[in-house]
Amino acid sequence: MYHIILAFITAFLLTYLAIPSIISVAKKKKLFDEPSDRKSHIVSTPSLGGIGIFAGTIFSVILWTPFNFFGDLQYILCAFIIIFLIGAKDDIDPISPMKKFIGELVAAGILVFKANIRLTSLYGILGIYEIPGWASITLSIFTILVIINSFNLIDGINGLSASIGSLIAITLGVWFLMIDRIEIAILAFATAGSTIAFLKYNITPAKIFMGDTGSLLLGSVCSILAILFIELHNIIGDSPYAFKAAPSVAFGILILPLFDTLRVFITRVFQGRSPFHPDRQHIHHLLIDSGLTHMQATFMLLVVNCFFIFIVVKLQNIGTLNLLILILGIAAILSTILLFIASNKKKYKEVRS
């Protein structure tokens, strides 16, 4: 237990102390995220906060993970280094989406093939239980890539990605602690510690953004935690801490980044545009357009994510597929209401102007 507390504190302190120096260097070198029509900030802001998150997380994990628990952690750290390099390069000198995707694919491949972060069962969704080897590899890599990029996509307003990432890491970290998987819990709480420290500098008015360096790392950590959460239910059996619908519970815990990505991609396709074409259709953009401030929108979405965690924990007994349909339905209704409010607010502003 003390390893986990120390991992959190170490990551928090290192990131908290490192961020001011990162801000200073970014300003001297003019490494800013510039405002644009698609972005929600209006002043040039340093965007290398992810360096502090990475440093705090990795240092703390290496320092406090007991050697006998180290396991496949070396491969996970290798994947994180690749993700860090991709993010840092993109924050300093933007790279093409294809190059970024290839880098993410390499990192995902390391996690699946070397660290064995792999989905092997759908727990009865659509009647599917055990997944064949090739399908398991494909699904696992796809899941990792989706979660990584979903965090990148929600990193659009102050505090959002860091708040949601911290919530997910702590929620899953507590579960890993309860089933005595100390090494995974340390990773979760170290990530939460560094991310919460970063939040101090990211609340409005934001002194720094996490950039791709931070959002891609957060997505990587959460993808690992989510897949291991699902997979370890094959091992813990009738443990009092086992959930009846693990895949749906995991989806509910990650509901905000996953559903927002799914909703935006579907919307773009129906509008005849590429699903990767950037716009202001994300849930956080709709909240801002409806009149909320950055921190109000972030707090609201954090509460909504907590609500979904409560729902999936309480209703886990209704079955994996039923629970998945329920949370998708609730999320769809809530986002439709929000879209309606934002649309009316926008029309009202246009009429007044």
Walk through the language-model features, giving the residues of each.
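Membrane-embedded alpha-helical core segments of multi-pass
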Residues: 81-85, 103, 107-118, 139-149, ...
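Membrane interface segments of multi-pass transport proteins and intramembrane proteases
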Residues: 30, 91-93, 122-131, 292, ...
